[in-house]
């Protein structure tokens, strides 16, 4: 292979490297991780509470099609999800305190 052939290949490689560096890297909009999962769980608890509040309000106003048993089930779901969220928070705080008390 001649020197001119190698120079041509080298030039092509440099052009490709420049093109690659100009191309933005596509990153996922939501990076999977603990923080995003925790936020999703908290949002779900909030949504459950909002649905229960809305159902209770509709029942109180006498909107047709809203039964008392549906309202009670939604309120219980909301209560249980909130209790679970509190327990998870307590475990997280406990784990954080345990890690902070470790000697290095």
From Swiss-Prot:
One of its GO terms (molecular function) is cytoskeletal motor activity. Keywords: Bacterial flagellum. GO terms for cellular component: bacterial-type flagellum basal body. It holds the Pfam family FliE. It is found in: Bacterial flagellum basal body. GO terms for biological process: bacterial-type flagellum-dependent cell motility. NCBIfam families: fliE. Belongs to the FliE family. This is Flagellar hook-basal body complex protein FliE. The lineage of its organism: Bacteria, Pseudomonadati, Pseudomonadota, Gammaproteobacteria, Enterobacterales.
